């Protein structure tokens, strides 16, 4: 695996860790004042745990340098879906501008993952 892609995976792991922390109920309750909608703790813990699980996967791939194409393809699809959802909810006014910026980060990683997938066929 190329060094740039390992760094990209490590950066994605860090982004996911911060996302998992942001959605954890103790933190998220203070984030509601920033325009994020209120949610039941069950949903917040579910989202937080999935973000963390993907982050651990990114970290593991970066650490071992053993690419798992299926995981990277699923990650690209998930990142793209999140970026589209954040953009859609921002454009109709349901999410604050920060959601658009977060979506741009996810879109960047999705494109980078797809680039790597097509390049290493």
Identify the residue ranges that each predicted region occupies:
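Cytosolic juxtamembrane helix and N-cap/initiation of the first transmembrane helix
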Residues: 1-15
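Core segments of alpha-helical transmembrane spans in multipass integral membrane proteins
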Residues: 14-22, 39-63, 74-80
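Membrane-embedded alpha-helical segments of multi-pass transporters/permeases
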Residues: 21-24, 59, 87, 111-114
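Membrane-interface helix termini and inter-helical loops of multi-pass transporters
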Residues: 28-39
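Juxtamembrane helix-break-helix junctions at the cytosolic face
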Residues: 30, 57-70, 90-91
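Membrane-embedded alpha-helical segments of multi-pass membrane proteins
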Residues: 53, 81, 103-108
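Membrane-helix boundary connector in multi-pass membrane proteins
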Residues: 63-66, 84-101, 118
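Membrane-water interface at the C-terminal end of transmembrane alpha helices
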Residues: 108-121
